[in-house]
Amino acid sequence: MTRTITPSITDDDALIEATLRPRALDDYVGQEKAKGNLRIFIDAARGRDEALDHVLLYGPPGLGKTTLANIIACEMGVNIKSTSGPVIERPGDLAAILTNLEAHDVLFIDEIHRLSHVVEEILYPAMEDFQLDIIIGQGPSARTIKLDLPKFTLVGATTRAGLLSSPLRDRFGVISRLEFYTDEELAFIITRSARILGMEIKTDGAAEMARRSRGTPRIANRLLRRVRDFAQVKADGVITMKVVQDALALLEIDEMGFDQMDRMILLTIIDKFGGGPVGLDTIAAAISEESDTIEDVYEPFLIQNGFLNRTPRGRVATKAAYLHFGRIVPEPPQGKLF
């Protein structure tokens, strides 16, 4: 199922994000704590003419990890080489990337938690000592030589920090968690994006769109493009609150930002499993979706906003979920006295 509000990046997102992406920390909206810390670390590194310490960015998808990696390179005045964990299959792949870096360059690895153990072993000395261990020959005659690397900055991004091995995580000097955005921050981002794309948007239209964007800039920008299409064909081209409401009604995105899949998850727990607790794999089987996708993509927003609880016994729909769908909230079971 194709989701308009999935925080995962799509081909359309990749094409347009380059246009909308800020290039400097001062232009980056939100994430004030992470941004403030990075400003200090970047200014200090530039003042000493050193490479920035390695940076780990983690949090739900669509919150700006890739954007921050590019901003770090721009602020440091260096080049950035971007790749992802699944692409680096063999140690030789990583060695080829590392040996092509220049002094102080940024190496950005998205989905860094998906690096294989063998590749990680090559990365440890590269991060810590800026050396690459290369094995020449095979068997008893094999020997290891150390190749010096330029001092570089590794920026790793992950949605699942818990899957990182401790040795890898401990080698990052800067670790920042990105949080969901406020409606006010998203409205500012939407207004800025509309201006860049040459759209006219009213304040109430931006606020309504922000409210339904699930705290995620990537979703906000995607909704903006879909509402722009609606405004062009069904209205006078100006994005107002009424235009946003009508457009998102057609896309089946409700006032909380829920789409069909969110409703399916919560209603399955409520209607089929008595509100829970129910195991993740059981939910996945009931709605024909992958367990990892539910856990990484759908659940964070539902949990953050109090519609779902994750317990040791399984997932439980909250009172807010029952009320949102007009269901009667069940009475808590009465404990036995004897």
From Swiss-Prot:
Keyword rRNA-binding (UniProt): no
Catalyses which reaction(s): ATP + H2O = ADP + phosphate + H(+)
Entries under CDD domains matching the protein: AAA
Protein localization: Cytoplasm
Binding site for Mg(2+): T66
Residues at which DNA binds: R310, R315
Subunit structure: Homohexamer. Forms an RuvA(8)-RuvB(12)-Holliday junction (HJ) complex. HJ DNA is sandwiched between 2 RuvA tetramers; dsDNA enters through RuvA and exits via RuvB. An RuvB hexamer assembles on each DNA strand where it exits the tetramer. Each RuvB hexamer is contacted by two RuvA subunits (via domain III) on 2 adjacent RuvB subunits; this complex drives branch migration. In the full resolvosome a probable DNA-RuvA(4)-RuvB(12)-RuvC(2) complex forms which resolves the HJ.
Domains (record comment): Has 3 domains, the large (RuvB-L) and small ATPase (RuvB-S) domains and the C-terminal head (RuvB-H) domain. The head domain binds DNA, while the ATPase domains jointly bind ATP, ADP or are empty depending on the state of the subunit in the translocation cycle. During a single DNA translocation step the structure of each domain remains the same, but their relative positions change.
Family: Belongs to the RuvB family.
Protein name: Holliday junction branch migration complex subunit RuvB
Species of origin: Geotalea uraniireducens (strain Rf4) (Geobacter uraniireducens)
